Amino acid sequence: MKSKIYSWLAIGGLFAALATDVHAKNVILFLGDGMGISTVTAARILAGQLKGMPGEEHALSFDQFEHVSLIKTYNTDAQVPDSAGTITAILSGEKTRMGVLGVSASVPRGDCASSLEHELPTILELAEEAGKATGIVSTARITHATPGGAYAHVPDRDWENSSTLPAEARALGCKDIALQLIELPHGDGPDVVLGGGRAQFMPSSAPDPEYPDKMGLRDDHRDLISEWLDNAKSRHYVWNAEQFQAVDASFTGQLLGLFEPSHMQFEADRSQDPGGEPSLAEMTKMALGRLSQNKEGFFLLVEAGRIDHGHHFGNAYRALTDTLALDAAVAAAVSATDPEQTLIVVTADHSHTLTISGYPTRGNPILGKVNQAASLVSQANSKYLPYTTLGYANGLGYKAVYPDLTDVDTTAPDYQQIAAVPLPMETHAGEDVAAFAAGKAAHGVKGVMEQDRLFHVMMQALINDPTKD
């Protein structure tokens, strides 16, 4: 794969020769997992209503970015995509199959031998080769599809730790995602990694420090956290909020923070976490403080991974409050960076089946019931029942007999919106998602774009920075 990396660096040089005014010292990619356009709209209204406004007129931080595009999200083998195929397009510049990560579309899912011959370099790896600082921040497991797409190359996104690897794959030399992060052969590896998923790095004999009844997941008996700490000087590991907050702002080493055995808490539940967790905005600010110390610039991936999970559970409240956490993180990044040196892109990997419907009056609570529906339904229709503005096309919220919501608080955090089709979990949706861009080279985000084009926009901005001597 090394030759492919040098090839991309050469392409970066070509971009520089053609357009020397579009290069940025830094690139920050914010990824709202599952943050379709209906999610952005609903979150915008919710944010406004939380401020005492009707809501519709409010603007999220990234709503104010000047450059906006629609992004086509399909995988090469799927009309409605998954996060592995989409993040590969975004971070490696090629659309690929559903379920594979960092490998080309010629690799069937689960085919280790084929994957070893068809790895795709990622923008994080290219940034490391170019001498830039790199970071990954996520509220999901750091080995999950989106953060994993920054550094891993596997034919199955589920190969997150050694116990998930088939025997044949082990024999052929395929490595699990957690191990690939620890052994990343490009540069010195990411300078900042903050998220969930510490069980993926811990041996099955080791109890979790926060939940002693939970054990690590690795069956190869390796403690990857200890190995990572031992492999270089100036490395620091944290797993709770107190340790995170104690990290000195002037710290120049590499930082690993794994705050949960699996995914981090939803933003709505974060304050109740036993060990304490930093917010997405706090992790973003920490990462920016560390990465900005590199005079060559940096690449940072920030994922709000639990937006997706809230939708899968049919729980709009948690999906939207996690979207607001992403909004706060974007605002923090805008405040902390120079637009003349930094490209910021905000997008989603795919959408969800969330709908905004009915004819609610202006300012009606977005999580509430449609308050004007009765005037639009014939009085002869005795079967009319209240319904919510937000709903899902499918998922866990299906009711064989439609319930009477008259006395139900649909704005409650645990309320599950009604779904039209019964499924064990709500699915992704296939419509285009939005991309918002600001700063240097943001004009490359425009029109209707194939998802893999985002990689090329970011690469054009990041490599061959004209301020570099």
Model-found features: residue ranges?
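Glycine-rich phosphate/pyrophosphate-binding loops
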Residues: 119, 124, 129-149
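His/Cys-centered metal/cofactor-coordination and adjacent catalytic loops
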Residues: 102-117
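Bacterial N-terminal signal peptides
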Residues: 9-17
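Sec/Tat signal peptide C-region and signal peptidase I cleavage site
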Residues: 18-24
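Bacterial N-terminal signal peptides that target proteins for export
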Residues: 1-9
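A post-motif C-terminal structural segment
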Residues: 25-26, 35-88, 113, 143-469
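Structural beta-sheet core signal
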Residues: 29-30, 136, 346
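Substrate-binding/charge-relay-adjacent region of secreted/lumenal peptidase catalytic domains
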Residues: 97-100, 174
